[in-house]
Amino acid sequence: MKKGGEDVRVDKIKVQLLMTKGPHTQQELAAKAGISRQTLSAVMNGRNCRPELLGKISKALGVEPKEIIE
């Protein structure tokens, strides 16, 4: 994660590769992360992501946040 808790962008390709192992769909990942599918979709399509949201997504994927950012 960047210093100071700045917004970051999620690397869509890295997340998609991790999703091949499960959870397999955006709906499943969103549910596991405790966020809406719409929020996950926006992040996957390039919207900046706050550190808290990044943490939820990375935890649901079973990786460290730094592993899924651009």
Q: For each predicted feature, which ranges?
A:
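A short, Lys/Arg-rich alpha-helix, primarily the initiator
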Residues: M1-T25
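DNA major-groove recognition helix of helix-turn-helix
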Residues: M19, M44, L61
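Helix-turn-helix DNA-binding elements, focusing on the entry/boundary residues of the two helices
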Residues: Q26, R37, P51-L54
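Short alpha-helical "recognition helix" segments of helix-turn-helix
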Residues: L29-A30
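Recognition helix of helix-turn-helix/homeodomain-like DNA-binding domains
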Residues: I35-C49
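Short, basic-rich loop-to-helix N-cap that marks the start of a DNA-contacting helix
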Residues: G46-K59
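Short C-terminal boundary/hinge segments that cap the last helix of small helical domains
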Residues: G62-E70
